[in-house]
């Protein structure tokens, strides 16, 4: 990790941005996909009218995504469904597919991003792929019905607090109705205070990458220690 004073030196920030761009482009070239490029909300062609509650699209960094996935405190991936809320062009879905999850799902309200993600899933080429049940779902996140399996939920600050609050409320209710292990990885946690309102999901000590928090269900038989 590069200290902030170093990042602010002349030319360093530009060099870091260039290096990041190269890494994204290499990932796309190597795996025959297209995950790069931001997309503003007005361009998204959303399935809902509440576009003001969404954030613009910017993909997770492949290196950070792989680190997060490698440090998940779960013993048997095959029991869990991985869900990226606000999954964009599907980069985290492709990274998650490198692990033997029961299924990998992306929830995306933009028709444009969903279409790209669907193409990426179909074209993805990676000898490390372990999960082949991968799908992008084009739906308002508030209307998404969480699977009954244990879950790993990934949030890269995808929504404004009003929308995120409702999604978390739905998730908490799902855990209450069907107690099971649920992990939530929240990157760039600007609205972390919303988790304080949840009854069945609480923060753990885990911080797999800088600027991340991990939450876990406190269903019977599960500890919030993160182990």
Where are these regions (language model features)?
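S-adenosyl-L-methionine
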Residues: 1-78, 114-148
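Conserved class I S-adenosyl-L-methionine
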Residues: 79-88
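Glycine-rich SAM-binding Motif I of class I
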Residues: 90-94
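Conserved SAM-binding motif I beta-strand of class I
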Residues: 103-108
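Residues in the short beta-alpha loop(s) of Rossmann-like NAD(P)-binding domains
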Residues: 110, 120, 188-190
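Active-site segment flanking the S-adenosylmethionine/decSAM binding pocket
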Residues: 136-176, 180
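C-terminal substrate-binding/active-site "lid" region of AdoMet-derived donor-dependent transferases
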Residues: 162-219
């Amino acid at each position: 990790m590069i200290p902030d004073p170093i990042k602010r030196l002349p030319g360093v920030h530009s060099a870091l941005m260039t290096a990041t761009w190269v890494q994204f482009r290499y990932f796309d070239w190597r795996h025959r996909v297209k995950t790069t490029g931001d997309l503003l909300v007005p361009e998204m062609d959303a399935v809902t009218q509440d576009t003001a509650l969404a954030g613009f699209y910017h993909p997770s960094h492949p290196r950070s995504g792989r680190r997060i996935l490698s440090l998940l405190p779960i013993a048997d991936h095959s029991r869990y469904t991985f869900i990226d809320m606000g999954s964009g062009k599907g980069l985290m879905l492709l990274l998650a597919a490198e692990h033997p999850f029961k299924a990998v799902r992306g929830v995306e309200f933009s028709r444009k991003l969903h279409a790209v993600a669907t193409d990426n899933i179909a074209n993805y080429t990676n000898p490390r792929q372990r999960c082949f049940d991968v799908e992008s779902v084009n739906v308002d996140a508030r209307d998404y019905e969480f699977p009954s399996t244990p879950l790993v939920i990934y949030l890269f600050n995808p929504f404004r607090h009003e929308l995120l609050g409702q999604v978390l409320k739905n998730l908490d209710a799902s855990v209450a109705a069907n107690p099971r292990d649920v992990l939530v990885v929240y990157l760039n946690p600007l609205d972390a205070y919303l988790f304080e309102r949840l009854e069945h999901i609480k923060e753990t000590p885990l911080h797999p990458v800088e600027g991340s928090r991990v939450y876990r269900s406190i269903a019977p038989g599960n500890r919030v220690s993160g182990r």
